[in-house]
Amino acid sequence: MKIFDGHTDIMADVVTRRKAGEKNVVKTHHLHKLEKGGVEGANFVLWMDPEASAWEDVELGMAFIHDELRDSPDVFHHIKDIEDLVCDKNNAKIDIILGMEGLAAMGSSIERLKWLYEQGVRCASLTWNEANDLATGISGDAKRGLTSDGIQVVKTMEKWGILLDVSHLNETTFWEVAGMATKPFMASHSNAYTLCEHPRNLKDEQLLAVKDSGGLVGVNAVADFLHPEKPDIMHFVQQVDYMVELLGIDHVALGFDFCDFLHLDQQKEPEDRHVTTSLETSMDIQNVIKILEKKGYRHEDMAKLTKDNFIRVYRHHLK
């Protein structure tokens, strides 16, 4: 079963390694994992620490990303419009939709948002947990939501065709976004709070609001969002089952958010890391597929879950 991963931070690794002089980072370090997992497309997002990154860092990061794309035309098919979405990949291995995980560095500048759009960014979250000039994430003041500038950015994103990701928003901001959205939005890498009470997870009412927008929720494999003690692949499967029961198959997808390659020089020893057993990297994705198929998920439902739901939502946004 071929997979569209709703959230990967591989581009953060691309930027880090290219700063150090490497080239062909995805081919060297990631492609074998993606191929083993059956990943043929993903939202490849650029994340930068909102407390330590300036706009110039975003510009440099995007330059490195486009260098990577140009150096590997046999790997990447960059989707920027509806024609790209539906056309053949011309033998490239991976469909890539560029995204931003947080917009803190752009301040409130619509001109900078336009620049990101021109760079090919087609999905974005307003914040990565923090409070910024646009909105408030889960670590910010619970009573603070969208700013007036944030409202304009949401409207502009919808107008231009940038899919809004609500995964890191606090509840106040979430509900303000839900109340003003006129197109489907997504929680690309979020789980159900009912099954795991973590502030990054969404309560049932929020999940239903995503559904009501016509959007989707991508189930997340990060250990902390699955179980507080001993998360494993079955906790991930339970999240899928729960959301399918609550939302229907048309509004559930996969947004794994694998972190095995991040901060490699600072990682703890494997036995000390809090990981999701049997679902640690892209290479493990087919383990999930096999379990879901054994549970009786039909082929057409699996197709929606693994790729088609994302395609449907992007059809509402791409020009």
Where in this protein do the model-derived segments appear?
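Outer-membrane beta-barrel pore domains
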Residues: H227-I233, K268-L279, L292-H299
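A generic structural signal for well-ordered alpha-helical surface patches
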Residues: A63, M234, Q238-D241, F256, ...
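Mid-to-C-terminal alpha-helical segments outside catalytic/metal-binding sites
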Residues: T277-K319
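Conserved active-site loop/cleft motifs that coordinate metal ions or position small ligands
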Residues: N43, V252-G255, D301-T306
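Active/binding-pocket-proximal capping segment
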Residues: K183, H235, D260
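Short acidic/histidine-rich active-site segments
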Residues: L247-E271, S278
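Extended, charged catalytic domains and RNA/DNA-binding interfaces, predominantly
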Residues: M1-F4, T8-N220, D224-L226, Q239-V244, ...
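Electropositive phosphate-/nucleotide-binding environments in soluble metabolic enzymes
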Residues: T28, W55, E59, I233, ...
